[in-house]
C-alpha cells in the first residue's frame, strides 16, 4: 500500500518584530518584503515531498493572546523565533514555550519538537552569538531542540528549517495522513476519449 501525504501543523511564535512573517513569506513566496506587523493569525500550506506543512503565524502581540489556544491546538512542531540583535527576545522564548506547553497540554514536553530560530543574522548589530543562543536554550528550555541561525532578508537557512521538519516527518507515523486514493494530481492530463456501452 502506498503511503499517504502527511499534514504537519507548524506554529511560529515569538515576540513581535522578530521576523516571523518575513521568515514565512521568504519560504512560501521566495522573496523578502518589509512587512507591517501581523494582525491576528496568518495561515498557509506548502508541500514538501510526501508532507504538507500547515504554517501558522501569529502577531506576537498581547491583545491577540486569546487566539492562542485554537492557534496552538494540534500542533506537531513549534518554531520559536528571536531577534539576534535584541537579547530580550531570546530570554522571552522560555515564556513563549511555557505558554505553548500550558495551552496545548502536551503530554511530554521534553519530547515535543521545538525549533529555535535566531533571526536577522544579516544585521551587523548582532548581540547574541549562535553559541550563546544554543547554550542558553539548552540551559533554559531543554527538551527536543533544533537551532538554526537565519536571515529572512538574505535567505539564510530558511529553506533548511522547513526541509528539516519535512525530513523528520516523512518516516514517522502520523494519524492525519491523507490516503493516496484521496490525493488529486494537478499535473495529470485526463484522456478526452469517451466510450459507449
Curated annotation (Swiss-Prot):
PROSITE patterns linked to this entry: RAB (PS51419)
Lipid-bearing positions (S-geranylgeranyl cysteine): 196-197
Domain of life: Eukaryota
GO MF terms, alphabetically ordered: GTP binding; GTPase activity
A biological process from GO: protein transport
InterPro entries (UniProt xref): P-loop_NTPase, Small_GTP-bd, Small_GTPase
Keyword hit for Heme: no
Coiled coil stretches, renumbered: none
Amino acids binding GTP: 14-21, 33-38, 57-61, 119-122, 152-153
Cysteine disulfide links: none
Family of the protein in this entry: Belongs to the small GTPase superfamily. Rab family.
Protein name as it appears in the record: Ras-related protein Rab-7B
Source organism (scientific name): Dictyostelium discoideum
Gene name for this UniProt entry: rab7B
